[in-house]
Amino acid sequence: AYFSDETGEYELYLLENKDGAKPRQITKESSAWKNSAEWSPKSSHVIYSDRTMTLWLVDVLTGKETEIDKASGEEIRDYTFSPDGDWVAYSKSSPNYQSALWLYQISTGKKHQITDAVFSDGNPVFSNDGKFLFFLSNRDFNLTFSSYEFDYLYNNATRIYAIPLLNDGTKLTPFVK
């Protein structure tokens, strides 16, 4: 998968890895700038986001695009597939300008918010065995006094956290049933 402006617009193309293969244009007549594309583990889907703050799922065989979610404040930039390829984890900003983690299940088309937007959570990554979802969160308030600005600051607020998954690695617990 790659992006090109061959048509005059920035579009997503797929190119099979073999001699003589011709590129196949997936998105058409899109005026929105697109962010990085991620392949599913089984190479059946690609996800990408764009400047309209939308996260898209593309079926590689049919070229069908499905809107996963749309943010209201900032672009969706953090997204990843689960090892089995059925789940997409991503972070999305909330009206309070904090971000929460979400899961989208490809087989059902359902999405679930899995962290609240009290803190800023992002950069989700599934463990290789599918048993954990790791993410970064700004929730450690190491209040200290700034020696330069005569004010308080929060230093080293970001930490790595993990959410345990069920043994089969396909469902999140206790958030998704």
What is each PLM-predicted segment?
Residues 4, 13-35, 58-77, 92-94, ...:
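Multi-bladed beta-propeller domains
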Residues 1, 43-46, 85-88, 133:
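Hydrophobic beta-strand positions that form the internal "hydrophobic ladder"
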Residues 81, 87-99:
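Loop/turn-rich, solvent-exposed surfaces of beta-rich toroidal or solenoidal domains
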Residues 53-54:
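Loop/turn residues immediately N-terminal
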